[in-house]
A protein has these predicted regions:
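An N-terminal, helix-rich hydrophobic module
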Residues: 1-119
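Acidic-histidine catalytic/liganding microenvironments
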Residues: 10, 178, 320, 364, ...
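Short, hydrophobic secondary-structure boundary micro-motifs
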Residues: 15-16, 184, 273-274, 370, ...
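Acidic, proline/glycine-rich low-complexity intrinsically disordered segments
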Residues: 36, 88-91, 95-96, 100-466, ...
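Short, surface-exposed loop/turn segments at secondary-structure junctions
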Residues: 40-43, 343-344, 574
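Phosphate/oxyanion-binding loops and surfaces in catalytic or ligand/nucleic-acid-binding neighborhoods
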Residues: 53-56, 63-70, 178, 232, ...
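Alpha-helical protein-protein interaction modules
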Residues: 357, 405, 417-622
Length: 622
């Protein structure tokens, strides 16, 4: 008799199958139950080790002994006519079938019910933790808080809005550096431009006790700035004044206004602020005008005119090579240009960021913007350790800088440090509560945590503020609520302008693939595959992001491992959501994270929130 036949006769193979399936089921149930009782990790490991060690003795017993009506007997002592091995085999087949059904049922229950709930609970726990911290830290409205509203352009031709906006922003920036003041961010303050809103509403929305209003009138080289400080709760005018000068002394005018505000609010000044609040940025009035014009384009993310802004800043630098802020703003501008144009030479843009950021730092090492610009460029190059250091340096220079807090917060969300990322994101919204993109990301995190109401509220606020890309998130929310018709319409309408380089009509095909039937999904996958196959230097960020949503996580990881995109944020942040679980638990995830540079960052500053480092150096993620 052959060995295989003898193993079958003695029911060893059936015993092995029954043992393995039963052991797997025990391990899975233990993994679910033990954490509920706060059991330490070694208990679960001990169960696995004991079951593994027990396999060999169990097989030896199955080989040596046979189950009879009289109990276990050595196989050689059982006569052929007394053997009930065939009956035992039949019963074992039944047991194996039952245990297998239970195991398969548990596997399905874990994958489709427990796992999403665990992921959502983890994200919700993080969200609640950070929200509690933010809520605990949030004080009552301080009497030393202020919003600087956009000054009105009263120039004869009403064509100097960039200048009036620039004046108010410069004063805002000067006040924001005073640690004893709470200053609302630019985006939120400028939201009320031209709205003639009740100041009590403004104060409540921005969390400030005072607002600074004003107007700017320029004619030829002459400038008149009128400003007034108003208390928001009763509309009481605390102070007002007018200042006359010319374009050669705009910094002196800004200094006088900022100084008057700090005096009125009795702000405590530190260090050099006691003598100077507004440093002279440039000796060239023309260079400063060009800087303000470019800044206006940069602030409204007017991608159509980015090249005009770049040309203007380069001209400003030619007029005054020592104009550090022009160098810094040019670096930041080159950072965002690729996100608005698929035709941008990414390598050249990154080189420009490095060049102008470093020249800005050489001229003025205190410019947080320059370090933030370096950080964002390092992100694109997957130089995450340097990125992290650049953002930390920028925050040390200016803890209230909105751009630094927001960019750094996104970076942390992308790298898996969800808790810290949300702290920075909420810090951003504390300073600038109407920053549309920050609201969009807050909505994304709330959606991941299962908070549909919060996600809807913040996503809609971002959309009302003019952020079109948030339609993608509103579509995801509609889908979560079972409204796929609305989801398709939202996604197609909102993403039409973000699919640069993709075939015309892609927005409809992808939207239907995401929220339609299987046939539509197949068409969308084919479209994405064809696009990625023909793409050259970089691909549109939407492609790998929707690959995951279309049920192709492995393909998305492979694409992101070998291709550059014009914006990695949504994809990398997706890794740490319930939807990204298939990617971060994939056998190829460690190879992916090493290839893109994440592993090096984790080795340097610690594992991400959902992962643990093994003795072998790999990361196991939940």
């Amino acid at each position: 008799m052959s060995l295989i036949a003898e193993l079958k006769r003695r029911n060893v193979i059936r015993s092995a199958g029954l043992y393995l399936v039963g052991a797997w089921l025990v391990v899975q149930v233990a993994g679910t139950i033990l954490p509920m009782f706060g059991a330490v990790d070694w208990i679960a490991r001990s169960i696995v080790i004991a079951l593994a060690i027990g396999f060999i003795p169990a097989m030896v017993v199955a080989w040596v002994f046979e189950l009879t009506p009289a109990g276990l007997k050595r196989d050689e002592d059982v006569k052929t006519e007394d053997s009930i091995a065939s009956q035992t085999a039949h019963r074992m087949n039944q047991w194996l079938l039952v245990v297998s059904i239970v195991a398969i049922g548990y596997f399905a229950f874990d994958k489709f019910v427990l796992a999403p709930r665990r992921d959502a609970a983890l994200v919700m726990q993080t969200t609640a933790h950070v929200a509690a911290q933010i809520g605990a830290e949030k004080p009552n409205v301080s009497p030393k808080s202020i919003a600087v509203l956009a000054f009105t352009d009263l120039s004869p031709g009403h064509d100097q809005e960039y200048f009036s906006d620039g004046m108010s922003e410069e004063i805002l920036n000067a006040l924001a550096k005073v640690k004893d003041l709470k200053v609302a961010g630019r985006t939120s303050s400028f939201y009320y431009k031209g709205r003639n809103e009740d100041l009590r509403v403004v104060g409540k929305a921005l969390g400030v006790a005072n607002v600074l209003e004003g107007s700017v009138r320029t004619q030829n080289s002459k400038v008149r700035i009128t400003a007034q400080l108003i208390r928001t709760d009763d509309d009481f005018h605390l102070w007002s004044d007018s200042y006359d000068g010319d374009l050669n002394d705009v910094f002196a005018l800004q200094e006088r206004i900022a100084r008057a505000i700090t005096d009125q609010l009795q702000a405590v000044l530190q260090g050099d602020q006691k003598t100077l609040l507004v440093p002279v940025a440039t000796s060239s009035p023309e260079a400063y005008k060009l800087y303000l014009q470019a800044t206006a384009i940069f602030n409204r993310r007017d991608g159509v005119h980015f090249h005009d802004a770049i040309a203007g800043l380069k001209q400003a630098i030619e007029l005054d090579p020592k104009f550090a802020r022009a160098h810094s703003r040019l670096a930041a501008l080159y950072d965002v240009v690729p996100q608005y144009s698929a035709d941008t030479d990414l390598r050249a843009a990154l080189e420009a960021v490095q060049q102008y950021a470093r020249s800005a730092i050489a001229l003025d090492p205190t410019l947080a913007e320059a370090y933030s610009a370096l950080g964002l460029s390092y992100r694109v190059q997957h130089r995450y350790i340097e990125e992290h250091a650049a953002y930390e340096h920028a925050l040390a220079l200016d803890p209230n800088d909105v751009t630094t807090n927001f960019w750094y917060g996104l970076s942390e969300l992308m790298d898996g440090y969800t808790r810290h990322g949300m702290q920075l994101l909420d810090r951003t919204l504390t300073i600038d509560p109407m920053l549309p993109n920050a609201l969009r990301w807050r909505a994304k995190m709330e959606l991941s945590a299962g908070d549909l109401a919060g996600a809807q509220r913040n996503a809609q606020r971002a959309r009302d503020l003019g952020l079109q890309v948030v339609d993608m998130n509103l579509a995801e929310i509609a889908h979560a609520r079972g409204d796929n018709t609305n989801a398709i319409e939202r996604w197609a309408a909102g993403m039409r302008g973000y699919l640069q380089g993709m075939p015309e009509g892609s927005e409809t095909i992808i939207a239907e693939g995401l929220y339609g039937d299987d046939a539509a999904r197949t068409r969308a996958i084919a479209l994405i595959d064809a696009y990625v196959a023909q793409a050259r230097d970089q691909i549109n960020w939407v492609a790998p992001y929707v690959m995951v949503q279309l049920g192709e996580p492995a393909k998305a990881l492979a694409t992101m491992r070998t291709s550059r995109t014009n914006n990695d944020a949504d994809f990398f942040a997706l890794l740490w959501t319930p939807q990204g679980r298939a990617m971060r638990t994939s056998p190829v995830f460690n190879a992916f994270s090493r290839a893109v540079g994440l592993t090096q960052l984790w080795d340097k500053i610690g594992p991400p929130d959902l992962c643990k480092k093994s003795d072998a150096g790999d990361y196991t993620c939940e």
